[in-house]
Amino acid sequence: MKILIAIIIFSAIILFHEFGHFLFAKLNGISVTEFSLGMGPRLWSFQKGETRYSLKLLPLGGSCAMVGEDTAEEEIPGSFNAASVWGRISVVAAGPIFNFILAFVLAVIIVGFVGYDPAEVLEVDKNSAAAEAGLQNGDIITEYDGYHVDLAKDLYVYMYLNDLKEGDTVTLKVRRDGRTETISYTPDVSVRYLLGFNRSDASSMTVESLIDGMPLQEAGLQPGDTITAINGVEIADGEAYDAYLAEHPLSSESVEITYDRDGLDYTATITPKEYRTPQLGFSYNLGYTKTSGLRILKYGALEIKYMIRTTLLSLKELVTGQLGFQNLSGPVGVVDAIGTTYEESKSEGTLMLWMNMLNMAVLLSANLGVMNLLPLPALDGGRLVFLIIEAIRKKPINREIEGRIHFAGLMALMVLMVVVMYNDILKIF
């Protein structure tokens, strides 16, 4: 069921994108030879007028094939190149624009049912640097270190992608009683001492994984080892471990760890590693607030703005190397993500299940719109670059040269899709 729903959502987004191309091709007198959902061999099709409408085997894409779209011919009546340059620009741009329109409509539905998430300060820690700087409960954060904040999720994503370092100064703009206040402070630093391991579950003391460069790994412990004592005090389970640390917090002093491996006891003397973390000194809203009237449209638009900004920020992180290639997902990964969200949302009730599905559709549709507008050969954005140059020059770039560039881009895109799909499959299985 989850796979079917995921495929339907993904296919609907692709179909709406291609419908944008199709509609504006018709409006500009360009003949469409085939409008299809999916890739590969046809499963079913029918002919109406000049256009064949097809459903194909692989539900991983779609197409709107126009006469003369990939040729240098201009004389063919009804061909893509026979249309005016602004007509062709509208046809190419319509796909991504329709994705943004679809995302906006779905976002408005979500906001209408669920509401929006204001970046409201819920609680300021007493005696913290934030409290001393004047931050108050109920303040609405509108800017964080120069980054404009419309919604709480804006704040969350920005802080996730931009680690706060010790000594950094945080500058907030907040809305309070109808006026804007500016608050600057240097966050306090929390000091903890860590051993550097993850347990298989909260009740167990079996080491599931070790953190690179941390004390337990450097002492030679391995996944599967079970910690049985600390400084001679028996640790029977996770609860006993938590109780021990509550009474004897780790510090810079060495501790003696006893652990079991394959039925044999071993002992290691370990110095916990200091871990310093800047603390913002406040918590903020992650829930939703109901709204009505035109504000639904406003916050629907802000949801789309958030999705577009997040996509662009993620692309920036990929280019700068802060996100790895393994973070990319293709159609297989997208379908799996939708399916996983579907399964995890079942326990939240029918309304939230479908709101989460719509939210995934908003994210994917906005993401597809942004990605297609990238100025890369074979993508809509790459075609728009050539068309805009043609509009400025009053004459087209050599069609054969343009065709070769787009073909090379298409080949590179297909190779990337295969690699990303392989990566998706590895992550799933």
Question: Where do the model's predicted regions map?
Answer:
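Alpha-helical transmembrane segments of multi-pass membrane proteins
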Residues: 10-14, 65, 99, 103, ...
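Small-residue-rich helix-interface/hinge motifs
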Residues: 2-75, 371-393
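PDZ/PDZ-like peptide-tail recognition elements
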Residues: 89-122, 157-161, 165-211, 217, ...
